[in-house]
Structure formats: C-alpha cells, structure tokens
Amino acid sequence: MHLNSFCLKKVLWVGLSLLVGGISINTHAVTLNFSASLVQGTCSLSLDKSVLSLGDVQQANLRSETLLNLQPVTLTVDNCNGAASASLQPVVIALGPGKSQNGKWLFRSSDSDVGGAGVMLVQSASQPSYASTEVKSGDYFPLAAVGQTPVNKQLQFFAGVSCGGVTDCATVKPGQLTANVNFIFAYR
C-alpha cells in the first residue's frame, strides 16, 4: 500500500504540472524606471540689503585715491547641508563687471553713464580706506577647510565710490553710476 500512495502522488504531480504548463496565461509587463541626482552640499546666501545706495557724490570731492560714501553690507552664509567633497573647499565667489583703474578693481555696470568712476568693494569688519585690498571679480572667500562642510558665517563688506588714480579721475563726468556683484556658492 505504501508503494501505491507513492505512485499516486507522483502521478498527481505529473498531471498537475502538465495541466498548469498547458494553460496559456496572458501576461502584461510594466517597467519601473529609476533616476537620481548626485549633488554636492550647498548653502543659502543672503544679503542684509538688496540695494546698497551710495548716495550723491560731488564731482569735486572725487579725487585720486579716495573712497567716498562708504556703506557696509553683510553676506550671510547659512543652512549648509550635504557632504563636501574630500578634495574641494567650499567658497563664495564674487563676480561682476568693471575694470581696473590705478591698480584697483572698480565694479561698474555697462548701463552706467557716469565717466571714470566705479564702486570699490572691500571685505572688512571695519571701515576701509582706498589703500585696503579691494575685491576683484573672481575673488573667492573660503568658508571652511578642504573637505569640511561650512557652518553659519557672516562676511562683512564695505562699498564706496572711487575713480582710481589721477588719470582716471581726470575723466570723471556726472551721471548715474550702477554696479552689481553676484555672490555664488561653489567648491574649488
């Protein structure tokens, strides 16, 4: 009897396999696509004012190697997140149109109609003078060491009107002076 039950089980399994194998089932396939972006860490940048008015400057007061109507502006770097690359340094880069006059970079937009003058920007916690090192387009300000994520930080700047040296100051004409500087978070 034991042999018969073994044979009966085998026959049932073979029959069931043939039955299931012989049935045609319509199948439908769907595809699941994946995507992801790998990004470096970043920070939020904000200025304490969006427009920095340098007021009216008397043409007669705009002399060689002077910096007039200085005004402070603060750049805040915060909400930093994500991991920094082990070989790169987080920085803020200053970019803007202008030109070098008497060895000093003066920011100035192409729509300015004033002659010979521009805006000198200095990164300093205290009021600078014309002799201070100015910010040039492309200068960068480190926020942390290489491979480190920055912590909240404030960078103090001062901006003032200048005409550079004797030659450029001789070409000063009255008009509207506009300048812009973009501060960009980057890894270097």
Predicted regions, residues:
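Mature extracellular/passenger domains of Gram-negative fimbrial/pilin and adhesin proteins
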Residues: 2-7, 22, 26-188
